[in-house]
A protein has these predicted regions:
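Polybasic/polar functional segments that serve as interface/processing modules
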Residues: 1-192
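Alpha-helical scaffold elements adjacent to nucleotide-binding pockets in ATP/GTP-utilizing enzyme cores
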Residues: 141, 212-216, 248-250, 297, ...
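Phosphate-binding P-loop
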Residues: 189-196, 277
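C-terminal effector modules of nucleic-acid-centric enzymes and ribosome-associated factors
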Residues: 194, 198-201, 349, 504-650
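Conserved catalytic-core segments of large NTP-driven translation/proteostasis enzymes
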Residues: 198-206, 210, 214-218, 362-546
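P-loop NTPase switch module centered on the Walker A-proximal segment
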Residues: 198-293, 305-310
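Conserved Switch II/interswitch segment of TRAFAC-class P-loop GTPases
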Residues: 281-284, 288-295, 305-326, 335-355
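Active-site glycine-centered loops adjacent to acidic/histidine catalytic or metal-binding residues
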Residues: 343, 401, 606
Length: 650
C-alpha cells in the first residue's frame, strides 16, 4: 500500500476531477435505481446471487427496448370522451355512469386511495368547453359516483367558474369553458387503509427545520424564538441548545376533504392516535440534525427511514452553506425527489434573499443535480407542480416565514396533493429493517422500522438478527402498531412498531432484520436459515476524495439502517479517485450483516463520499477482482476471506 506522500505525488484532486465526480452522480444514481429492481434475498449463497446479478445485467443491457412492451400496437377500441361520460343523459346514461365510475376507481387503486381528476379537460388536454349548466350537471354526476365509491372530493382549482372561491381564471379565458381540478380521496375503513408518505427534513444548523414542522403540525405561528419547536425535541440538551441531535419523528394528517387535522383548541397539539384515527393521509416527517457533529446520525436517518421525498431547508439570510450541500448531495445520491423551503424571509434583506436564490438555482442546475427549479408563488403553481412532481427532475422551491405565516398555506396544499411515491413488493418474502429499539413497561421490547417487502400479522413467528456471531433468534410478534394505533397486519412500504415476545432489549440493535420463520407456501416446513455475510462486492462511484483510494482503506458504510466500518479488500484496478466507477470488495470490520444483491450502499469518511450497489454477496480471495495486481498488494495485511456465508443456527 502506498504512503500518503506517494498518493499526493500521483496528484491531488483538481477542480476538473471534482466536477467529474459531480457530473457522474446523476447517471450513476439512475443506474443504481434500475439495479435495485433486481434485488434478490441472499439466501441461496453467493453463486446464486452472482447468477441473479448477471442475468439482471443482461436484461438491463436491452432496457431501451422495454418501451415496445408498453405500446398497444393492436387495434384498440375507440375511447369514449370524458365529456360524453359526464353529460350523457340519454338511454345510455347508466352505461356512461358505470364507465366513468370504473375510470375513477382504477385511478384510486393506482394512487393507493387518492387521485386527481380534471373536469373540463380530456385526457389528451383538449378542452371540453363546458357551460355553467353543463358544469353543474357534471358535478352532480360526480357526486353520485363519489358516494358509491365511499370517497370525498376537494376542488383544488377552477377556471371560469362563477362564484368559485378557488378560481384562477381571467377575462381572456371566459370563452374557453369551465375547468376544474379535483382531489378525490377514498374514506379509509381503518388505520391500515391510511395513505402514508415519508419525508426526510434536512438542512444546515439553524435553518428552521424543527420550527417549520412545529408550525405545520400545531397550526400556530412561531414567536421568532423557537416556541413551536419545543414539542419536537426528544432530549433536555436539545431544548436548552435549540438544536436537534437525534432522529425526531412528527406526523401531519389530512382528512378525506384535504383539510389539515388539527385541534379545535388553538395551540393544542393532537396526539398521534387522534391524528391517525381522523386522517385519510398521513405525512411522516423525519426531523434530522443539521450540525456537522451529527452527520452520521443524519445519514442513518436518511437511509433507515426510506423517505419518499426529501425536504431541504435553507435559511434566507445564510444561503446554501455548511451541511446543506452535504445533505443535498446525499439526497441526490439516493435518488430521492427534493423540494426546497427557504425560511426566515421576514428578517432577510431583499438583496441577500436574491443572492440565496441565485446560488440555489445555480447549484440545482449544475451537472451533478440536473434539477429544474420552480418557484411556487401562487396556488396554481403549487397545484400544477405537485401533480408533476413524480418527475424527479423538478425541484419546487417555497419562500416562507414561520413568524408571519407567508406561503405556509402553499406548503400545506402541496403536501396534501403530493402523490404517493415508491414501489413495494407485497408478494415477496417478509423483510423488516429495525431502525430503533425501545423497552416499554408492561409490554417488553419494541422495535420500529420500515417493512421492506411482504406482509406480517400479529402472532407470527419471526427470526430477529443477526447478532455479533451471525445468529438469529426465534421470537413471536405480540402486537403491531402504526402511528401508535394497534393494527392486526402490516404490509410492504409501511412504517410500524413490533412488540417482541421473550426478547431482551440489549439483544436487539439498529440494523437488524426481522424475517418470517416459516414459508407461506409450506407453513409446516421451516424457511431456509438466513445467511449473513462479512464480505461483499459492490459497484461504486467515488463522489469526492482528496487523493487516491487503495486496498486497506476504511470508511463508515451505510446500508439501510446498518452503519458499520468497512475495509476495502480488493479493487478491480490499482487505485480509484474522484469520479471513478469501479468494482470493489468490502469487508465489515465488526460483525456480519444481512445483505441482498441490489442493496444500495453509501460510504463516507469525513468529506469523502461514495455511492454504490451490492452486486455479489460473499468474496472469494482465490478470484481477485484485479488478477494483474501484485500479490503482496492484495494479500499483505488484508485478512484472507472465505467464500462461505455465516449461516445462523436459529
Amino acid at each position: 500500500m502506498s504512503t500518503r506522500a506517494e498518493r499526493f505525488k500521483e496528484g491531488p484532486q483538481t477542480a476538473q476531477e471534482r466536477r467529474a465526480g459531480e457530473s457522474a452522480l446523476s447517471d450513476f444514481a439512475d443506474y443504481v435505481q434500475q439495479q435495485q429492481a433486481l434485488r434478490k434475498p441472499a439466501v441461496a449463497g453467493s453463486q446464486a446471487a452472482t447468477a441473479a446479478s448477471t442475468n439482471g445485467a443482461s436484461k438491463n443491457a436491452h432496457a431501451e427496448l422495454d418501451i415496445l412492451d408498453s405500446l398497444d400496437l393492436a387495434d384498440a377500441k375507440p375511447r369514449v370522451r370524458l365529456k360524453e361520460l359526464l353529460l350523457d343523459d340519454g338511454e345510455t346514461r347508466d352505461d356512461a355512469t358505470r364507465q366513468l365510475r370504473g375510470i375513477i376507481e382504477d385511478r384510486l387503486n393506482e394512487g393507493h386511495g387518492e387521485c386527481l381528476f380534471d373536469v373540463g379537460l380530456e385526457d389528451n388536454g383538449d378542452r371540453q368547453l363546458l357551460t355553467e349548466q353543463e358544469w353543474d350537471a357534471a358535478l352532480a354526476r360526480l357526486k353520485r359516483i363519489m358516494n358509491a365509491l365511499a370517497a370525498d372530493w376537494k376542488i383544488l382549482m377552477t377556471k371560469n367558474v362563477p362564484n368559485s372561491p378557488v378560481d384562477v381564471g381571467n377575462e381572456n379565458m371566459k370563452q374557453k369553458g369551465c375547468i376544474g381540478k379535483f382531489m378525490i380521496r377514498r374514506r379509509p375503513k381503518d388505520v391500515d387503509d391510511t395513505i402514508e408518505t415519508r419525508i426526510a427534513v434536512v438542512g444546515n444548523v439553524d435553518a428552521g427545520k424543527s420550527t417549520l414542522l412545529g408550525v405545520l403540525v400545531k397550526g400556530t405561528l412561531d414567536d421568532g424564538r423557537g416556541k413551536t419547536r419545543v414539542n419536537l425535541f426528544r432530549h433536555k440538551h436539545e431544548i436548552e441548545s435549540g438544536r436537534t441531535s437525534s432522529v425526531g419523528m412528527e406526523i401531519l394528517g389530512f382528512d378525506t376533504k384535504g383539510e389539515v387535522v388539527v385541534s379545535a383548541v388553538p395551540g393544542r397539539k393532537l396526539s398521534w392516535e387522534e391524528i391517525g384515527k381522523r386522517s385519510a393521509k398521513v405525512i411522516s416527517f423525519t426531523d434530522l440534525a443539521g450540525h456537522e457533529r451529527y452527520l452520521r446520525t443524519t445519514v442513518f436517518g436518511l437511509l433507515s427511514s426510506e423517505p419518499n421525498y426529501c425536504l431541504l431547508m435553507v435559511a434566507a439570510n445564510n444561503g446554501l452553506i455548511g451541511m446543506s450541500k452535504e445533505h443535498l448531495g446525499i439526497a441526490l445520491a439516493l435518488n430521492v425527489p427534493v423540494m426546497v423551503v427557504i425560511t426566515k424571509i421576514d428578517i432577510c434583506p431583499p438583496q441577500i434573499l436574491q443572492q440565496t436564490i441565485t446560488q440555489l438555482t445555480k447549484i440545482l442546475k449544475s451537472p451533478g443535480a440536473r434539477k429544474i427549479p420552480i418557484f411556487i408563488k401562487n396556488r396554481e403553481d403549487c397545484i400544477n407542480t405537485a401533480t408533476q412532481f413524480v418527475s424527479q427532475r423538478i425541484c419546487p422551491i417555497f419562500q416562507v416565514s414561520n413568524v408571519t405565516g407567508e406561503s405556509l398555506d402553499l406548503v400545506r396544499e402541496f403536501l396534501n396533493i403530493l402523490p404517493h411515491h415508491g414501489k413495494y413488493d407485497v408478494d415477496a418474502a417478509f423483510e423488516f429493517h429495525i431502525n430503533d429499539t425501545f423497552s416499554v413497561p408492561f409490554v417488553g421490547t419494541v422495535v420500529s422500522g420500515v417493512v421492506k417487502s411482504g406482509v406480517v400479522h400479529a402472532g407470527d413467528t419471526v427470526l430477529v438478527g443477526p447478532d455479533g456471531l451471525g445468529q438469529f433468534a426465534t421470537t413471536t410478534i405480540r402486537s403491531i402498531e402504526r402511528k401508535r394505533i394497534s393494527v392486526p397486519v402490516c404490509s410492504a412500504g409501511q412504517s410500524a412498531s413490533f412488540a417482541l415476545r421473550r426478547v431482551r432489549r440489549k439483544d436487539v440493535r439498529k440494523g437488524m432484520v426481522v424475517l418470517l420463520a416459516k414459508s407461506d407456501a409450506n407453513p409446516n416446513a421451516p424457511v431456509a436459515q438466513p445467511k449473513v455475510y462479512k464480505e461483499f462486492i459492490a459497484e461504486v462511484l467515488i463522489l469526492s476524495h482528496a487523493t487516491t483510494i487503495r486496498t486497506k482503506y476504511q470508511a463508515m458504510l451505510h446500508v439501510g439502517p446498518v452503519s458499520q466500518t468497512c475495509a476495502i479488500i480488493d479493487i478491480d484496478r490499482p487505485y480509484i479517485r474522484t469520479g471513478d466507477r469501479a468494482t470493489v470488495a468490502f469487508r465489515f470490520v465488526q460483525r456480519p450483516e444481512f445483505l441482498c444483491v441490489g442493496d444500495r450502499i453509501l460510504f463516507r469518511e469525513g468529506r469523502t463520499k461514495g455511492l454504490g450497489i451490492v452486486k455479489q454477496v460473499g468474496y472469494d480471495s482465490t478470484k481477485p477482482l484485479n488478477p494483474d495486481a501484485p500479490k503482496d498488494e492484495t494479500e499483505s495485511g488484508v485478512v484472507k476471506t472465505s467464500t462461505k456465508a455465516v449461516t445462523s443456527q436459529a
